[in-house]
Amino acid sequence: MDLHNKLSGCFIGKNIGGTLGMPYEGIETYNDLTWYRPVPDGAIPNDDLDLQLVWIEAFKTHGVALDSQRLSKYWMKYIDCHMDEYGIALRNMNKGVMPPLSGKHDNFFTESMGAAIRAEIWASLFPGKPLTAGYYAWQDSMVDHCGEGIYAEMFIAILESDLYASGNLRESLDFAIVFLPDDSRLKTAFNDIINLYESSISATEARDLIMKKYGSVNFTDTVMNLSFIVMALLYGENDFSKTILLAVNCGQDTDCTGATAGAIMGILLGKEAIPDQWKEKVGDDFVVGDGIGCTTPKSVSELIDAIEKIHDKMPDELPEITLPFRLPELTDFAERVPWVVNGRRIEFPGGIKIDSMLYPEVLGKNPLLKTIVSFNKTGTINLTISTIGIFVCNWDKNFIGSKGDQMQPIPAPHRVRGGRIWPVTVKAGQKYELEILMYSTWPIPEVYVIFSDLHTHRHIIPQYHI
């Protein structure tokens, strides 16, 4: 099979799987899809593809010298996407915290799916060169992830790059698993799934066992979702339709699992072998989201043309990761954000997270947290408070709301879970008191406090006056 057919299959498969899964993103239960539902009139915007289209523009400019520092500049100049780890990485970089710390510092979502979904561009730029694809996936993912979040993108890039050359899905899957360190949770999960598959239990049973052992309250958790992808690849038995439906029907981060499974199957089978019923509903065009601020390829054909032109000029000497590979140790730093807790001034080490277990003797049974903030803008912004705890919140000495459940927190302004979000109106330079009264629970919970743009969810960095 020619490389052009595989490259086209990769990104058409990515588009199909993302379009199939998008309407079910975040659904935690098992789905029962057999085809698109609803049936689309074309492709839809998806960050699974959007950021990769920016990366191809970055590679056109920087070539093999592209690294995390150069990618961070493209983030800050051209990407206005603030979901989960994207928003935290941009917040960090706007404060001068650059890679690799931008992916670790104050980041609840270090091991989410945001990097793993960007792997196709590196595999496709370096087909049959998995250690080079893995190198660029590492440079990419460290901007907004650490730990398993980095290994996840490297794993997918290595698998896909090797698959371009091998044409054997199981062979490339095994090769990519070997790359992972022995203490990686991803590696443990993948080996568990292979054992489940080889024991002949059903795909539905395998999905339930994955959830039991690796399930997360965060529907974008990368160990959980990559486990679904690997399960779908094994149980799909080289059938495009069966594989993407298995991935999406597992639930959780369905646009990402469907898109990645579709890309892998597209590489394996090529564009021509993808059933027409899937292709004709999304077509060749990309629909790029509003958060992308530069000119990008407008279709699969245009993207593949750009990739093939880069192939023609690729130098012989390319960077590679060395095996065995292990991420370097990374030490975070403390921001020292001031609060008054039960009458005592405390500087917490995070800009978002108040780690109350650092001071259990001060917080007592009913912690009262106060701070005073100001902003460099005028208008209405969002205040997000996320915690497993029960609390009452006052803003500028006025009650604005409370939380009466003990749901696990997901501190993201666009999808807050285990918390509340309120619009508050501010004037530039004016000071506002924020007061959070926590009710008695044990252990004393962490509290996440985020200010963000009302519409884009861009993190807004306050000034503190305690």
Set out the residue ranges of the language-model regions.
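Extended extracellular/luminal ectodomain segments enriched in beta-structured repeat modules
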Residues: S374-N382, G429-K431
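Short beta-strands within extracellular/lumenal beta-sheet-rich domains
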Residues: Y359-S374, R417-W422
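Structured, active/binding-site neighborhoods that engage oxygen-rich ligands
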Residues: M1-K365, I385, I390-I400, I436-I466
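Beta-strand-rich ligand-recognition modules
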Residues: K397-I444
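Secondary-structure boundary/capping motif
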Residues: L7, L368-K370, Q430-Y432
